[in-house]
Amino acid sequence: MRAYNFSLRGPAPIHHTLLQRRQKTGITLQTLHPKHFDQGMILAQTPYPGLNIPNSDMCTPGQLLDFLAPLGGQMLVETLRNRAFAPPLEDVGWYGKDMSEAELKHAPKIQKEDSHIDWDTWTADEILLRSRVLGDLWDNITWRKSISDKGIDHTSLPLKRTIFHGFEKWQNTDFSKLSKTDDSSFCLVTRENPPKILRVTSCTVEGGKKGAGSRKIIANLGKFAESDTGIHPRCIEV
């Protein structure tokens, strides 16, 4: 038994359903294929057109699983009662029968690299989405930038991974409204056009205590800040 989203196939359909911002989902009960993963005969499936994902703009994998799990249990019980598992088996799947393998999208296992922030291409909305779906995100840039933006050659600095435990979208682009005395959080300015501001609610710097990264990065910003940079002391342009 597994969650499906129409053309998704693979080990992580719930995560990819949310990452692709899909609005509908459902459940499939299938047999085990003798050779291939996730290609068994469909014994039961959520009817067309599927189920609306509750609160889809804010839904997490855990919440989606909690929504689907009791429905999946009910489907399994009904399948056992109807003995749909007994030969001759009937494929009752309604979606994808006329689709080629190329059209059926793969939902691969989530890897660590999926949480690696690509500042060149990820927008603020993409970062918030991945944070909600994947949990902690990370990069190797923020630590260096907290120092190198102040005129220091960043190539001479060691790489340090920063693990981000949470973000908030800063709705006001007026840097003057950011607190210069708050030592518990800082902001990152994205590269999209126009740039967006994300407040880091908590982070960990490689080699440091979990959740204590913000203070270390803010210490860098305070130590190396220059009055004529035009950058707010609590902001890093990544």
Protein language model regions, located:
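Donor/substrate-binding cores of folate-linked one-carbon enzymes
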Residues: 1-106
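N-terminal, helix-rich and Lys/Arg-enriched segments in bacterial and organellar proteins
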Residues: 62, 66-69, 110, 131, ...
